[in-house]
Amino acid sequence: NVRRPIAEVFSDIEHANVFFIEPLEYLPFVYMMKRSYLIITDSGGIQEEAPSLGKPVLVMRDVTERPEALEAGTIRLVGTDRDKIFNEASHFLDDKKYYEDNSLIANPYGDGQACSRIADVLDSIPMGS
């Protein structure tokens, strides 16, 4: 669970827009991710979903089972070192260009339009064929 270590790393920060939350149901969680500026996690699923929302992700692990996200630049491995996590998060929070350069990266998992493409193909098949 990443909540306790992150709360310790950022214990000196009191900011109205920083939230340390308990696990949420899926839809409220996606809503929170969409409204977030930066996501810090140890979840493999979030590493896959956050790029669809255009959110940079710091992963509190030393390895990931999502190498395509690492190669694309949609995630950064920061491990569990307090200073490394703080420094990388600060870089995203303090440098607008760095943030933009690292949040406007193409999603390595696709553009989210697969369903529409499949529906178009199915729609083009004549009935009864």
Locations of regions flagged by a protein language model:
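Nucleotide-activated sugar donor-binding and catalytic core shared by glycosyltransferases
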Residues: V2-S129
